[in-house]
A protein has these predicted regions:
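A short acidic (Asp/Glu
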Residues: 4-8, 64-71, 94-97
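Ordered hydrophobic segments in well-structured contexts
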Residues: 81-84, 98-103, 173, 238
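Short, solvent-exposed loop/turn segments at secondary-structure junctions
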Residues: 2-3, 60-63, 107-109
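Mobile active-site "lid"/loop adjacent to the S-adenosyl-L-methionine
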Residues: 2-34
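Class I S-adenosyl-L-methionine
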Residues: 21-28, 32, 91, 96, ...
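Flexible, glycine-/basic-rich loop-and-beta segments that form/coincide
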Residues: 96-166
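C-terminal target-recognition/interaction regions appended to catalytic cores
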Residues: 168-290
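Conserved Class I SAM-dependent methyltransferase catalytic core
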Residues: 26-87, 102
Length: 290
């Protein structure tokens, strides 16, 4: 999905690479990465031309993209010298993302592991190195937040859009009243039972500035120490309550996110609900997550 498909203002192109013979031959084994034409070239060379050196440039899908997990599991070659440059150094490219130049030595068969690439800026100046690697046996941050769904007795207080696990999808991570506000919602319900995790998720994904170099970096599940760090949890909740990515509006339903009491606001009329102030004080917080 793209910005236009998430918001309902456009459609993605279909059938670009899924009608080829190579796709039909290898898709079942190599997975959805074969929907990319450049992947089909890589797979065919890997399967049919032994001992060659492959030169490849693309976005950083092979070393880090979640959809390329099956590709990384099957592809066997030693990564040679690699370097990364900003994508907008190419003609007619405006996006802020990295493009990698890779060499693969297929005569030295080994799994795709850690790759250390040189990094050059738009002026061709060397600015350092970057490690490209997907941690094995670690859940993505999206799989982690999905695991907080469907807790017994939960009260729904909103919906969090959560497309992708990387910085390029940062703008698609926000909180709204109802998932019906989106034509193609991707995310999870926010409840009184998972608000703590939702706050951590949103704060972590938005508190680090997106750059062209980290654009494809993947967020993974947090270390368990977060669950015992009350100060960190409170900071994340405060960030989430006042973040511009919190788009709760009374026009679309009940606002459970009001963090102030009548006394705080200096008003005499009773507010529609006191969910958030009760939650913050601990009075309305489910015992299972206190």
């Amino acid at each position: 999905a793209t910005k236009t498909t998430v918001t309902g203002t456009g459609e993605n192109a279909t059938g670009v690479a899924v009608t080829t013979r190579i796709y039909k031959t290898y898709e079942k084994e190599w997975g959805i990465s074969c929907r990319e034409l450049f992947t089909q070239f890589m797979v065919r060379i890997h399967e049919q031309i032994n001992g060659c050196i492959i030169g490849q440039f693309s976005k950083l899908k092979i070393p880090v993209a979640p959809n390329f997990a099956s590709f990384r599991r099957l592809f066997r070659a030693r990564a040679g010298h690699c370097f990364i440059v900003p994508g907008n150094t190419f003609d007619n490219v405006k996006g802020q993302f990295p493009v990698g130049f890779f060499t693969w030595h297929t005569d030295d068969k080994r799994p795709v592991g850690e790759i250390v690439a040189d990094v050059f800026n738009k002026n061709g100046e060397f600015i350092g190195t970057k490690k490209l690697e997907v941690e094995q046996n670690v859940m993505s941050i999206n799989d982690w937040i999905i695991s907080t769904r469907n807790r017994i007795g939960e009260k729904i207080i909103g919906f969090m859009s959560a497309k992708g696990c990387d910085f390029q999808n940062q703008n698609y991570n926000f909180i709204i009243n109802e998932k019906s506000q989106l034509p193609h919602p991707r995310g999870t319900l926010v409840t009184d039972m998972n608000l703590k995790e939702i706050a951590v998720y949103l704060a972590v994904r938005h508190s680090v500035k997106k750059t062209w170099l980290n654009d494809r970096d993947q967020f993974t599940e947090p270390f368990d120490t977060w669950s015992h760090d009350i100060e960190f949890q409170n900071d994340c909740l405060a960030y989430t309550l006042f973040s511009i990515s919190n788009n709760i509006q009374s026009a679309f339903g009940i606002n459970y996110w009001q963090p102030f009491t009548e006394a705080d606001l200096g008003i005499t009329n009773e507010l529609p609900n006191h969910f958030m102030t009760d939650y913050i004080s601990g009075k309305g917080r489910p015992k299972a997550i206190q």
